[in-house]
C-alpha cells in the first residue's frame, strides 16, 4: 500500500508536528483530515476582555498538549452543539499580566452568553499574527478589533 502524500511529501506524524510548530494551520488541518483542536472547560478569567467589549472564553490546555506557536488565530469554536467563528489568542497575555500560565482565550463573533463551566473545542484555522506586548490597553483593543475584522473577512462574514 502506497503512503498518502501531500505537497510531494509523505504524510507522517513527524510532518504534522513540524507544520504545527511552524503554525501552518491550513497544512496541519489537511494532514490531520480535520481541524487541529484544543479542548477544555471554560474558566472565569479577570473579565478584562469583557471590559473592552471583547469578551473571551478562557481554557487552559494540558502541559502534554503539543501546541502551535503563541499567537492569534482565526478559529471556530464548538460550544453546546453549535459552531461559532472567532479569534483566539494562544499565549501568556504580555500586555495584561505576562502570566506564566499558557492560556487559550477566544472571542466569539455573535455570542454573548455565559459559558463558564461548559466544555468547548477550539479549532485553530489560520495563524494571524504573533502574540505581542502593546504599549496600552487601548492599542491592544484596536489590534483585537483589527484581528476580528480580518478573521471575519477570512470567514466571509459581514461586519
Give the ranges of each region predicted by the language model.
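Classical nucleotidyltransferase
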Residues: 1-55, 78, 135-139
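Phosphate/ribose-recognition catalytic cores of enzymes acting on nucleotide-derived substrates
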Residues: 44-159
Amino acid at each position: 500500500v502506497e503512503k498518502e502524500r501531500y505537497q510531494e511529501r509523505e504524510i507522517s506524524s513527524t510532518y504534522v508536528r513540524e507544520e504545527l510548530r511552524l503554525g501552518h494551520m491550513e497544512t496541519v488541518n489537511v494532514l490531520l483530515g480535520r481541524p487541529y483542536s484544543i479542548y477544555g472547560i471554560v474558566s472565569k478569567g479577570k473579565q478584562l476582555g469583557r471590559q473592552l467589549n471583547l469578551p473571551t472564553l478562557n481554557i487552559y490546555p494540558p502541559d502534554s498538549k503539543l501546541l502551535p506557536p503563541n499567537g492569534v488565530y482565526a478559529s471556530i469554536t464548538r460550544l453546546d452543539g453549535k459552531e461559532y467563528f472567532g479569534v483566539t489568542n494562544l499565549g501568556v497575555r504580555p500586555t495584561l499580566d505576562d502570566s506564566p500560565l499558557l492560556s487559550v482565550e477566544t472571542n466569539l463573533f455573535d455570542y454573548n452568553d455565559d459559558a463558564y463551566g461548559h466544555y468547548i473545542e477550539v479549532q485553530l484555522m489560520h495563524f494571524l499574527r504573533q502574540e505581542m506586548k502593546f504599549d496600552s490597553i487601548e492599542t491592544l483593543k484596536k489590534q483585537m478589533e483589527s484581528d476580528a475584522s480580518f478573521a471575519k473577512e477570512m470567514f466571509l462574514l459581514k461586519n
